[in-house]
Curated annotation (Swiss-Prot):
Annotated family: Belongs to the thymidine/pyrimidine-nucleoside phosphorylase family. Type 2 subfamily.
This protein's encoding gene: deoA
GO molecular function: 1,4-alpha-oligoglucan phosphorylase activity; AMP binding; pentosyltransferase activity
One GO cellular component term noted in the UniProt record for this chain: cytosol
Residues annotated as binding AMP: 166, 192-197, 201, 262, 286
PROSITE patterns given in the database record: THYMID_PHOSPHORYLASE
Domain of life from the UniProt record: Archaea
Alphabetical list of NCBIfam families matching this protein: AMP_phos, ARCH_P_rylase, PRK04350.1
Pfam family, one: Glycos_transf_3
Enzyme class, first EC level, given as a word: transferase
Name recorded for this polypeptide: AMP phosphorylase
């Protein structure tokens, strides 16, 4: 059947076509079926959506996923079958183990946008419900890395650090990168933006400087400073992972095997050789127990060995937020404070421990490393100087101060109702509160924690402050805070929460 193209102004992750009901019936296709579209020697496959009114009979609506088709182009449209990888997804749903070829086909079809949203979601759910074996995780990681753009380095040791996330205010990466680069090691850090959190490392660094660079620009930055703090999404290190993450987001699914494949495929594409993986565990974190964290760490190391990567895992307590601030500007202030010798002690200590692990790994590999400890490098001001160098080369102001980094001016303070000890700071709730306030899109939005677990509190003491950039966002955050105990103070009458 020949149809005339009509561009449709809808953004889609993959090529989608709109067919009038009459044309769909003639072709024998339904919504979520596929059609092959041929024009001028080009062939594309689109996923069908059927409509009564949005396009007329004889025309075919083309989404933004078809950038090369112009208005009025006449195309030949024929029904197309499902990709072969759909059968492999069915096998995984049945609890079968997939081989390297099957996983490779799934990765290739995700990368080429040949799977519908429903099929990709089925793959994610199958991986979550039935798990990925160690062998599947190894093969999946390898295949995901193969389709990404590659960075390569001349140095025998290229350091990296990654956290699996789940802890509010865990902004150790800029501090670690500054310390490690100041010690003379190479650490090209590509980071993510927030998916479900109030700030990713890239969002926080964007407060200081641009973070989107080409691979050539990243190489120049690292050559000049020894490190970088950039957004990995701009260089397509693991495009399949980015698409899988978007499919996981609505149900907050994070299968352990997929987590490992996500992290290590990006690290291999980035050219990293020695990687410390931060695995926070505890109430409210992604990993809830120490035994679960140990199992995940063992699998990280086994998959790393398969890929030729040296992996060390740091199992860290993740029940409480790490910094005082949650949200891009507030976390940036904490980073600068730690680099200046002040700031939240948990953020300082964790950064030092992770940097020292990297130093140990480099020394074991025979690399000449600064004899000083991470604490000595931080306390000497060398890490602050290196951080300012990186900010400058990435196009930011090297003289930026904490006073320059002002959070949103719409504020609300929440105080203790009783005397006692802070017995819990809810990681998930405080992250959700910061998002309600506008983070990460509003860089100045977020939450400042004034009392941590174990601190004494007297009735009337400020427990936390909400910052927003608009009154509407502040009101949304205020309503959320009123319905949850973000920071819990336990007194003698703790058993009775309230009377209603």
């Amino acid at each position: 059947m020949e149809l005339t193209v009509e561009p449709i102004d809808i953004g889609t992750e993959r090529p989608v076509v709109l067919l009038n009901c009459a044309d769909a019936e003639t072709l024998g296709v339904h919504s979520l079926d596929r059609v092959e579209i041929d024009w001028d020697g080009t062939t594309e496959v689109g996923i069908v959506k059927v409509t009564d009114e949005l396009v007329a009979a004889g025309r075919i609506g083309a989404s933004h996923g078809f950038p090369e088709i112009t208005d009025g182009t006449v195309v030949a449209v024929t029904p197309a079958g499902q990709p072969e990888s759909v059968e492999s997804i069915r096998r995984k749903l049945d609890g079968r183990e997939l081989d390297s070829d099957e996983l490779g086909a799934i990765v290739a079809d995700i990368e080429a946008d040949r799977l519908s949203d429903l099929e990709l979601s089925a793959y994610v759910c199958a991986s979550h419900a039935n798990g990925l074996s160690l062998e599947e995780t190894k093969q999946l990681t390898e295949r995901m890395a193969e389709v990404g753009k590659q960075l390569s380095w001349e140095q025998p040791v290229v350091a990296d650090k990654h956290s699996i996330g789940g802890v509010a205010g865990n902004r150790v990466t800029p501090v670690v990168v500054a310390i490690v680069a100041a010690a003379g090691l190479t650490i090209p850090k590509t980071s993510s933006r927030a998916v479900t959190s109030p700030a990713g490392t890239a969002d926080t660094m964007e407060v200081f400087c641009p973070v989107e660079f080409s691979r050539e620009e990243i190489r120049d930055i690292v050559t000049e400073t020894g490190g970088c703090l950039v957004w990995g999404g701009a260089v397509d290190l693991s495009p399949v992972d980015d698409k899988v993450i978007r499919a996981q987001r609505p149900l907050s699914l994070d299968p352990p095997g997929q987590v490992i494949a996500s992290v290590l495929s990006k690290k291999q594409s980035a050219g990293s050789s020695h990687i410390v993986v931060d695995i926070p565990y505890g109430a409210g974190a992604k990993v809830t127990s120490l035994s679960e964290a140990r199992d995940l760490a063992d699998d990280f190391r086994r998959v790393g060995d398969h890929l030729g990567l040296t992996i060390e895992c740091a199992l860290t307590r993740g029940s409480d937020p790490i910094g005082h601030g949650i949200g891009p500007v507030l976390e940036a202030r904490d980073v600068l404070a730690v680099l200046e010798g002040e700031g939240p002690e948990p953020l300082r200590i964790k950064s030092l421990r992770l940097a020292d692990i990297i130093f140990d790994m480099a020394r074991e590999a025979g690399m000449p490393v600064d004899d000083r400890s991470a604490a000595d490098i931080l306390d000497s001001g060398a890490a602050l100087s290196k951080f300012r160098d990186i900010v400058a080369v990435q196009g930011g102001d090297p003289d930026v101060s904490r006073d320059d980094l002002q959070p949103g001016d719409r504020t609300e303070t929440v105080t203790a109702d009783t005397d006692g000890l802070v017995v819990d700071v809810d990681n998930q709730a405080v992250s959700q509160l910061a998002r309600r306030a506008g983070a990460p899109n509003d860089h100045g939005a977020g939450v400042v924690i004034h009392r941590r677990t174990g601190d004494k509190a007297v009735a009337g003491d400020v427990l936390y402050t909400i910052h927003a950039e608009s009154s509407d966002r502040l009101e949304a955050a205020r309503e959320y805070a009123a319905g949850d105990e973000i920071v819990r103070v336990g007194g003698r009458d703790e058993a009775l929460v309230e009377r209603r």
